[in-house]
Amino acid sequence: MSLVSQIIINADDELRYPTIGELQSIQNYLITGSNRIRIATIIRDKEKEIIQKASKQIFQLHPEYIAPGGNAAGSRKRSLCLRDYGWYLRLITYGVLAGDKDSIETIGIIGVREMYNSLGVPIIGMLDAIQCLKEASLEMLGQDDAKIISPYFDYIIRGMS
């Protein structure tokens, strides 16, 4: 749900108009609208490059993952890891576009830790992978855009911790 929708629903539930603070939040969100669209476009267009950089970094941090018997050993397992990286990037862009973290919570965080545990995927590796995706993404963006997108990566990292 978008920031605007959430504010309206909250105000309606309480039978009131949006507060000054809520209206300011909407105004800030609308002011950054073109930036949010640009960020989502850059991440979409640079997805392969971001994943390539992040995977190189994560496998340098954890070479045991691509060693025989590792969670990303072999082309099939490795491609599944990279698929997940693309999924997380899309999830980040949904949050950026919506202006809140509800879509990340609804689509991606609930149950993900348990899923990875059941599959034998080390959580520390996924946390490191999201951090690597963040760093690779930030290389593609300016400082102002980094301030907008960073909290969404951090939210996923905290949610998986």
From Swiss-Prot:
Disulfide bonds: none annotated. The keyword Transferase does not apply. It comes from Porphyra purpurea. Contains one covalently linked bilin chromophore. Belongs to the phycobiliprotein family. Allophycocyanin is a photosynthetic bile pigment-protein complex with maximum absorption at approximately 650 nanometers. One of its GO terms (cellular component) is phycobilisome. GO terms for biological process: photosynthesis. Its main location: plastid. The modification N4-methylasparagine is found at residue 71. This is Allophycocyanin alpha-B chain. (2R,3E)-phycocyanobilin binds at residue 81. It is found in: Plastid, Chloroplast thylakoid membrane. It is a peripheral membrane protein. It comes from the Eukaryota. Pfam families: Phycobilisome. Keywords: Antenna complex, Bile pigment, Chloroplast, Chromophore, Electron transport, Membrane, Methylation, Photosynthesis, Phycobilisome, Plastid, Thylakoid, Transport. Gene3D superfamilies: Phycocyanins (1.10.490.20).
